[in-house]
Amino acid sequence: MEHIRTTKVEQVKLLDRFSTNNKSLTGTLYLTATHLLFIDAHQKETWILHHHIASVEKLALTTSGCPLVIQCKNFRIVHFIVPRERDCHDIYNSLLQLSKQAKYEDLYAFSYNPKQNDTERLNGWQLIDLAAEYERMGVPNANWQLSDANREYKVCETYPRELYVPRTASRPVIVGSSNFRSKGRLPVLSYCQQGTEAAICRCSQPLSGFSARCLEDEHLLQAISKANPGNRYMYVVDTRPKLRMQSWWDTQKDIGRIIVRISSKIWNDEKIRESDEKKRLNAMANRAAGKGYENEDNYSNIRFQFVGIENIHVMRSSLQKLLEVNGSKGLSVNDFYSGLESSGWLRHIKAVLDAAIFLAKAIVVENASVLVHCSDGWDRTSQVCSLGSLLLDSYYRTMKGFMVLIEKDWISFGHKFSERCGHLDGDPKEVSPVFTQFLECVWHLTEQFPQAFEFNEAFLLQIHEHIHSCQFGNFLGNCQKEREELRLKEKTYSLWPFLLADKKKYLNPLYSSKSQRLTVLEPNTASFNFKFWRNMYHQFDRTLHPRQSVLNIIMNMNEQNKQLEEDVKDLEAKIKQCKSGILTKDLLHAVHPESPSLKTSLCLKEQSLLPVKDTLRAVEGSSPADNRYCDYTEEFSKSEPAVVSLEYGVARMTC
């Protein structure tokens, strides 16, 4: 609270950035230790978590007041007009401090209290068991074993304690390969295809320098290849663009030639002492020693494949360009699509999906194992491995399975959530929408295969909400070792049980578990299959959304059908009792009920599309009255909906 200078400002205006007639709402702005709260004249509340705030901008003073623009990590943008410049300045400075915490203990998760006891908290963390997940895949088995080499995080600090490696890989091979790979991230198992034992493995790039090689690393890759009895060759998939890597390799060769020439001159110069010669050569070698990719001459039975996904800096720039297009008011159709194309965002989404498709085809069609890496193996590698597994295994397309997939390929294998999401006040160049891209790829798959996923779009959006909210401990920290040091399981709560408690909200009414059980997804990545995810990037701009949702109507119809089936069963049971001769006055009335006695509505229009449930907030930071799943009946009767809201139920979902 020491950062809050002004706790309450009245007569603040909230503008609609897409309104054609500059409509606004007038209300009171509050600052709390965790939230910014705006209450309009109709007592409608808008909550914004401080951790969601990406940037705050105070614009030049106008005749109507001082503008304050807040951009959030969940792509919400709010534009306030504060009457007095002094109040605006105080709010601005407070938000700058509150949105950028210096240490983990100051994040919301460490103070959030859902009123659970320690046992309930522990049960929530134990909901996802990765050891059980590997057992589901049939591991350990004759070809794969659980290694304890990283039990104390001595082999690789950013990997989990439990690593699955080929049974023929000895401890010296594991340690030697780790020393040869960037950040010590050696090749380990991510996914094993049941029945064929073709595997998806992951690692970081090798420290190959000019011509360096590592026998232990070569032996480990050979062991991975032999662990697949169905195919003796394997793919090494480098997710980086080939042209950049070729340019890097050419540069290394040029530097190598220079070193050879210089070293030759040094050795021929008798005036230079031997110690100086060694120092200079070592210095030049250290400067030239780089990181690269595997030399096919040193690795037998591998096939090399580049898939061309750009780095975190390109992705951050691409998203920024996309958001600039989204925030532009009054763009023509041509200008919007031109800006969307110029951002390159959908092109990057396609590149990630194409890489995952290559993995799936290699395993299904060629029965070949695949080793995936990028630079350090925690960004592009996580994207490709998780999406490849999603295409191959229908379990990951269930709600529980998707949670397991995120825990396995993202959280346990050290995707740097806190750095990529900017949880703390750190280097802005480390922030990048890597996980957002993953969720968007999954959304595109749900659009192409609407019956294949148990969860709906709301589930993906809710997860995206909480990677930035810092309300739960799942996404805090950059690796498992760091999370253990923070004692997150003792001090914070897991997100997953809260999502499962509201499972009904996130169910896909089109899901067919029987037809999808053994299906491998084969998405089409032609350009016409990619579209702008409006419900992600404009989820809070309600004026841009249609009034009804086909999926919500289907969900209501399903609920009605279930209720009708229960009514039919009740009536059949009572009719059966009547036929057996047991007839009472109450039973007779039940067999011939009045029309209103049926539990289901005779007319769909009589019911709201989504019922209001105030028992649990869908997103922490919204009041029950402002829940995303609120009924819009009252709002629809107005000339124009409210400007900013956390809702998206009926008004968001489109067919």
UniProtKB/Swiss-Prot annotation:
Residues modified to Phosphotyrosine: 108
Residues the record lists as Phosphoserine modifications: 595, 623, 645
Alphabetical list of PROSITE patterns matching this protein: PPASE_MYOTUBULARIN, TYR_PHOSPHATASE_1
Parts forming coiled coils: 547-581
Membrane topology annotation: Peripheral membrane protein
SUPFAM superfamilies registered for this protein in UniProt: (Phosphotyrosine protein) phosphatases II, PH domain-like
Disulfide bond annotation, renumbered to this chain: none
Domain Myotubularin phosphatase, chain residue ranges per copy: 124-537
Record's catalysed reaction(s): a 1,2-diacyl-sn-glycero-3-phospho-(1D-myo-inositol-3,5-bisphosphate) + H2O = a 1,2-diacyl-sn-glycero-3-phospho-(1D-myo-inositol-5-phosphate) + phosphate; a 1,2-diacyl-sn-glycero-3-phospho-(1D-myo-inositol-3-phosphate) + H2O = a 1,2-diacyl-sn-glycero-3-phospho-(1D-myo-inositol) + phosphate; 1,2-dioctanoyl-sn-glycero-3-phospho-(1D-myo-inositol-3,5-bisphosphate) + H2O = 1,2-dioctanoyl-sn-glycero-3-phospho-(1D-myo-inositol-5-phosphate) + phosphate; 1,2-dioctanoyl-sn-glycero-3-phospho-(1-D-myo-inositol-3-phosphate) + H2O = 1,2-dioctanoyl-sn-glycero-3-phospho-(1D-myo-inositol) + phosphate
Transmembrane segments: none
Chief localisation class: cytoplasm
Keywords of the record: Cell membrane, Cell projection, Coiled coil, Cytoplasm, Endocytosis, Endoplasmic reticulum, Hydrolase, Lipid metabolism, Membrane, Phosphoprotein
Domain GRAM: residue ranges: 1-101
Activity regulation details: Allosterically activated by phosphatidylserine and/or phosphatidylinositol 4-phosphate (PtdIns(4)P), and phosphatidylinositol 5-phosphate (PtdIns(5)P). Interaction with MTMR9 increases catalytic activity towards phosphatidylinositol 3,5-bisphosphate.
Family of this protein: Belongs to the protein-tyrosine phosphatase family. Non-receptor class myotubularin subfamily.
Note on domains (UniProt): The GRAM domain is required for cell membrane localization. The C-terminus domain (aa 540-655) mediates interaction with MTMR9.
UniProt-recorded name of the protein: Phosphatidylinositol-3,5-bisphosphate 3-phosphatase MTMR6
Organism listed in the record: Rattus norvegicus (Rat)
Organism ancestry: Eukaryota, Metazoa, Chordata, Craniata, Vertebrata
Gene name per UniProt: Mtmr6
